[in-house]
Amino acid sequence: MPACVLAYSGGLDTSVILGWLQDEGWDVHCVYVDIGQPGEDKQAILKKAQDCGAKSARIVDVTEELCRDFAFPVLKAGAKYESIYLLGTSIARPLISKVMLQVAREVGATAYAHGATGKGNDQCRFQLAAEALDPTVQMIAPWRIKAFRDRFPGRTELIAYCEEKGIPVKATSAKPYSSDENCLHVSYEAGDLEDLSVAGVDVVDFTMGVSPQEAPDKLEEVTVGFEKGVPVSINGQKLDAKDLVEKANELAGRNGVGRIDMVENRFVGMKSRGVYEAPGMTLLYEAHRMLEELTLDRDLMHLRDQLSPIVAEMVYYGLWYTPKLDALFAFTDKAQEPVTGEVTLGMYKGNLSARRRSSPNSLYDAEIASMEGGGSYDQDDATGFLRITGLPSRVQGTVTPRSY
């Protein structure tokens, strides 16, 4: 029998897909990619796959790699999709595909199956990553196969199939939305959130922190240390990437930081509404930007700001393993060399504010910037500077005067 690997979560969809693949004549190797999903009994999920006839089942923990090699490079680039979304799900998908192909090579599988729908972004991220890493891989996306959709048009048919096959599932009523979790964030979409008249923060049961209204009525300070643009410490304690993100989640979450509600443009062309919470990454992004204000040259910072949306778009679309993104990350690595130092922020009811910042590479010179008399800046120099800068405008104004 041919073999395939299945990105397996143990939920209703992938449980059905496991059974369906077996019905179609595949030996299925289930892979639960651990990217820091909280509150799940991973061993129970593994046992369920084995009990349902999987040829093999395993858990692969890549949480540290997700933070260190995927989230932090995107953070260094200052990339936010459409200026808001911190890309928590987008970042994880190419790593999941990498793991799936590594397992496929180990077990001799020729195909890779996943449960993403034909409407969303995840199908793009899974497949584009897989094809870049192994162009020979056969992708199986059941929700893009008409015969599968005809057989399982809705949740009722999925549950009935599980009952017929003896597959244990929680056959409860559907949640008013769907969610996707990892250590970087939680995303919420679909269900009641498709109605734009509904306030997303009122519908969603957030899990990573309290609401701003419930946060302490007292400002809490936190200090984040960076080396070459990479966060390395919190409150003076050096931490590995995973532990640092978890600590940032804890501190920012209890202060109501990091909730957004947005309508975004999906890669496939439609607009969709998403609610996100990313307390720790919101804190790290803000601290990183504050340190860049001290350490990056003006023109370099402005160029980086022009490139950040390009990085965000490529990550969102799933174009991780591409020469273009490799080159953009290489630029970022060079640009971030001076971004070393510490930033202290104040957290208060969902807000972040600068308290203190320092860097051995600071370009801020109080004597030059001072509004007081004296200092090392000669204001007379500005006259010549402005005469030269204004020359093209004076010539243009003589030739084609503007009305005013």
What name fits each language-model region?
Residues M1-A7, L12-Y404:
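Nucleotide-activated chemistry modules centered on ATP-dependent adenylation/adenylyltransferase
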